[in-house]
């Protein structure tokens, strides 16, 4: 009887298309109460080698051809059990066959079960030689997992490789509920290829068929297969009704693609979203090409543009070849500056202000590495399109440590800057930076003494337009040589907190750094790639005030700071606080008249920063940070958040973030000049929450309020209903989507999304709790 068991199990698995990804742990446990479990001891070993036990009221036979068992027939072998009113065993000699053909007929109240499936039906048949099996009018139920259904005839063929269902059905709903089901006139499951082919496929809600396809191919199991994924729909004020129907294409073992027709009612067309992934000897990468043939909204808003085609191309690649070659690509380009305002896309956002196009090839061996790269920017502002690209850039590093007590390094860079505008300055910059370090350390402290030379040469061209409009002139050839000296010392003190908190340990970590860089007037050098760096606590100990090499500020300063940490008895950090400052003995200058605070001639304690983290309990956490810069005359940035987190789906967070307009202007001068919504800085208070609100109902939401503008900045609300066989999600989002220069106010987009997930049939394609929170324009960040 065991010969027919794989048939039944394969049939169940073949049609199940089962996925548990969407089930939360508590819901899964509730659903498991509604499915049968295997209550007999599991038997190990090859089933064909195990004994067969047959119990029946009556038995008769005509050896060796036939045997008949009747009356409460109970046959057991290993973990398998077959019960029926009557079981007939037949054995016949076949012409040309070395062994006789052995078949089994089971009649009346046929019941089969093992540790994976239960089958009930009036009649069954099996060929024990070929393992071909037929089961008529069978009902099946998986054991220990959801999945059940029935078929007029279930057949097993090809040494258990193929399962064929005639008029078969499947649902993952618990017994007594047929909310949805999938039926087909014929279903063929190829276990080896892990694919199910369905003819005359009908999807039914209750007894009502709502979808039909003459042929459908669906992946089964973990093996990647081509086929349609679950569709999605939403409504937005930007595009009105939107519908997605993704198709997954398994091209080869090392490459695949997802092709998604995306219909947008207001745009009057279908955008084709094409994602391609690959893996090669040179690395792994992803390409995305989105294309909208025409856009009637864009035509109305931009009547002077020659084309209304909208597109995006994204390419990300990272790889190592032959252990020494490194290849990296980070490339994003769109058809027009309004693209990310009009279309949601995971590869860019309207708040970024620009898109990066970077290619790099690197070579690295012991003590040496070199990288050749090109970097361009596509600025989204229609008012200021000026941006510099590095075409190309060469970076070289050579290290030689343990030269006596010293570590040495030589860094070199050569780069050519090109502007998108023909009238802006351009330059070739060559930089050389030799460094020597003397590191000393023991168990409780360290001190590092460093000396370096910063030598830079500029060859600037195309200066006429700039020099004719500015009192400070740029020179064609500029040399800048600056020595730098730094001493950085750290200590770590530790004590047990037995009196206050037994088992806890506190550390005290003071740090002091002296930095000296002489002043060099850099007003004759145009600023190609420098901007003010953020001064959080760790940033206080940087060598540079500005990123890039065009502005290197003079320094005669001492940075001091202290960090204290508290660890519990499991060495988990429960609390830390850091406070530091920079004390300037002389003014930090570059000679650039465009940097307003250099005219104030300020010295003393100018920059303060502090960070803290407190893990109050396993469920409560608090983080915060503040940076005060007297050069900007105020608090530059600050942030804080407090969170209660019970698990992934139960959390509440309150947060606040602030950035002064002076800080934004100093760190992002080009973006600040066009980003009208940030002219008054950023001051936003927010709340994020996710929580089950009733039996099988849960809610997720986020709300941010701009205290400067006294209006909502962003909000999102999602509601989900989950059952054992389906889930429904409805989401609403209102987000900032640009600035109207004519009316001088922010533009918002409202979106309503709707998604259905079928438990046991679909993958988790819709928005889950974490996905919804992180898809927000102000994404959720964990405080714990």
UniProtKB/Swiss-Prot annotation:
Its main location: membrane. It is found in: Cell outer membrane. Disulfide bonds join 31-724, 173-725. GO terms for cellular component: cell outer membrane; transporter complex. Pfam families: LptD (PF04453), LptD_N (PF03968). Contains two intramolecular disulfide bonds. It comes from the Bacteria. Coiled coil: none annotated. The keyword Disulfide bond applies. Keywords: Cell outer membrane, Disulfide bond, Membrane, Signal. GO terms for biological process: Gram-negative-bacterium-type cell outer membrane assembly; lipopolysaccharide transport. Gene3D superfamilies: Lipopolysaccharide (LPS) transport protein A like domain. Belongs to the LptD family. Together with LptE, is involved in the assembly of lipopolysaccharide (LPS) at the surface of the outer membrane. Component of the lipopolysaccharide transport and assembly complex. Interacts with LptE and LptA. This is LPS-assembly protein LptD. The lineage of its organism: Bacteria, Pseudomonadati, Pseudomonadota, Gammaproteobacteria, Enterobacterales. The gene is lptD.
């Amino acid at each position: 009887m065991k010969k027919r068991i794989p048939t039944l199990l394969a049939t169940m698995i073949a049609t199940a298309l089962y996925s548990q990804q969407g089930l939360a742990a508590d819901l899964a446990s509730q659903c498991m109460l509604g499915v049968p479990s295997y209550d007999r001891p599991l038997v190990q070993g090859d089933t064909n080698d195990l004994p067969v036990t047959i119990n029946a009221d009556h038995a008769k036979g005509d050896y060796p051809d036939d045997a008949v068992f009747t009356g409460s027939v109970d046959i057991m072998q290993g973990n398998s059990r077959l019960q029926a009113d009557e079981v007939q065993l037949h054995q016949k000699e076949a012409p040309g066959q070395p062994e006789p053909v052995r078949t089994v007929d089971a009649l009346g109240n046929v019941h089969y079960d093992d540790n994976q499936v239960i089958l009930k039906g009036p009649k069954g048949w099996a060929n024990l030689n070929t393992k071909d099996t037929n089961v008529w009018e069978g009902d099946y139920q998986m054991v220990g997992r959801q999945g059940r259904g029935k078929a007029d005839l279930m057949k097993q063929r090809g040494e258990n490789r193929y399962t064929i269902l005639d008029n078969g059905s499947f649902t993952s709903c618990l017994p007594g509920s047929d909310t949805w089901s999938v039926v087909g006139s014929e279903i063929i499951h190829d276990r080896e290829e892990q694919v199910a082919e369905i003819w005359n496929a009908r999807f039914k809600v209750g007894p009502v068929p709502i979808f039909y396809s003459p042929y459908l191919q669906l992946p089964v199991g973990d093996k990647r297969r081509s086929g349609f994924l679950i569709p999605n729909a939403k409504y937005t004020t930007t595009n009105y009704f939107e519908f997605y129907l993704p198709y997954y294409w398994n091209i080869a073992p090392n490459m695949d693609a997802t092709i998604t027709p995306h219909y947008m009612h207001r745009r009057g067309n279908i955008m084709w979203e094409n994602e391609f992934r690959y893996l090669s000897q040179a690395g792994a990468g992803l390409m995305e090409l989105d294309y909208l043939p025409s856009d009637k909204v864009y035509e109305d808003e931009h009547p002077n543009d020659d084309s209304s085609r909208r597109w995006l191309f994204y390419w990300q690649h990272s790889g190592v070849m032959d252990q020494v070659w490194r290849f990296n690509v980070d490339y994003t380009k769109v058809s027009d500056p309004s693209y990310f305002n009009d279309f949601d896309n995971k590869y860019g956002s309207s708040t970024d202000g620009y898109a990066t196009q970077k290619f790099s090839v690197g070579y690295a061996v012991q003590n040496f590495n070199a990288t050749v790269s090109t970097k361009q920017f596509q600025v989204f502002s229609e008012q200021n399109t000026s941006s510099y690209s590095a075409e190309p850039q060469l970076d070289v590093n050579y290290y030689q440590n343990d030269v006596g007590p010293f570590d040495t390094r030589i860094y070199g860079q050569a780069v050519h800057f090109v502007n998108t505008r023909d009238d802006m300055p351009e330059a070739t910059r060559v930089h050389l930076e030799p460094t020597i370090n003397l590191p000393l350390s023991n168990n409780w402290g360290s001190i590092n003494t460093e000396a370096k030379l910063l030598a830079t040469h500029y060859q600037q061209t195309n200066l006429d337009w700039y020099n004719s409009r500015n009192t400070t002139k740029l020179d064609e050839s500029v040399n800048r040589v600056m020595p730098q000296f730094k001493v950085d010392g750290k200590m770590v003190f530790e004590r047990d907190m037995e009196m206050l908190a037994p088992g806890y340990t506190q550390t005290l970590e003071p740090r002091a750094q002296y930095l000296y860089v002489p002043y060099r007037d850099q007003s004759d050098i145009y600023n190609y790639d420098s901007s003010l760096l953020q001064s959080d606590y760790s940033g206080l100990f940087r060598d540079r005030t500005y990123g890039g090499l065009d502005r290197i500020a003079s320094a005669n300063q001492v940075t001091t700071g202290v960090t204290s940490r508290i660890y519990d008895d499991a060495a988990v950090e429960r609390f830390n606080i850091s406070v530091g400052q920079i004390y300037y003995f002389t003014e930090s200058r570059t000679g650039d008249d465009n940097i307003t605070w250099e005219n104030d001639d300020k010295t003393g304690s100018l920059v303060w920063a502090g960070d803290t983290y407190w893990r109050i309990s396993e469920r409560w956490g608090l983080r915060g940070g503040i940076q005060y810069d007297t050069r900007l005359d105020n608090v530059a940035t600050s942030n804080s958040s407090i969170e209660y987190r019970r698990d992934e789906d139960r959390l509440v967070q309150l947060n606040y973030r602030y950035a002064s307009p002076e800080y934004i202007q100093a760190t992002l001068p080009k973006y600040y000049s066009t980003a009208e919504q940030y002219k008054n800085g950023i001051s936003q208070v927010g709340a994020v929450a996710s929580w089950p609100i009733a039996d099988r109902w849960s809610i997720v939401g986020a709300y941010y309020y701009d205290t400067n503008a006294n209006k909502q900045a962003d909000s999102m609300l999602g509601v989900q209903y989950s059952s054992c066989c389906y889930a429904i999600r409805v989401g609403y989002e209102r987000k900032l989507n640009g600035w109207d220069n004519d009316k001088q106010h922010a533009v918002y987009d409202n979106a309503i999304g709707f998604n259905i997930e079928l438990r046991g049939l679909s993958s988790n394609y819709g928005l889950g709790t974490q996905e919804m929170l992180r898809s927000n324009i102000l994404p959720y960040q964990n405080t714990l």
